[in-house]
Amino acid sequence: AITKSTPVAGLPGRSLVPLFKPGQSNWRTHLYAEYHTHAAAPNFFPQRCVRDGRYKLIESLLPDTLHPDYKNTLTKLHRDYERREARNTLNLMSAIKNAPPKVKQAYALMRKPPRYQLYDLQQDPYEFENLAETPKHTETLNCLRAKLAQWRNDTQDPLLNDEALRQLTQEVQGISKKSSARKHTWRYPTYLSRPSVNK
């Protein structure tokens, strides 16, 4: 409407114009996101996410496997710290080892995420306590899982197909450097274009 352009048929989404007007808008109740990778194998770890006004659910499509970017993330955090605190030193691994239990647990989940992580963003905005296996939150977990599954179906997420996920994982993990990724003839347009099969 603002740009006077014609919407693309079949593309998910809706106008943001109501958000530019004064007052509150009941524009949406849930926000969805997906992640695959930024640079081939070094950080390939596909995840999907949904959140409402209070809770956030993350689904890891390669659950209980080591997150390939865990070590790189710690290295980046260490570098950032050294740039800011040139006079002090930090042994990040030692700091994590000696941290309070909830901090250690958060790093353990980051290193090897389970299938589902559920966080109460009002009570736990930094996402330290995974509530996915807490009986008290079963209803919330199931509701958000259903919303996420519906969104993945509606958007035709190709990684609903187990074979497509397996092929993409194998192809991406076969590339170890960004420079190799640029030269690689990627096959994923072929196998990701097949119809999705729900789990």
Locations of the language-model features?
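C-terminal cap/loop subdomain of S1 sulfatases and analogous C-terminal strand-loop tails that border
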Residues: T3-Q117, E139
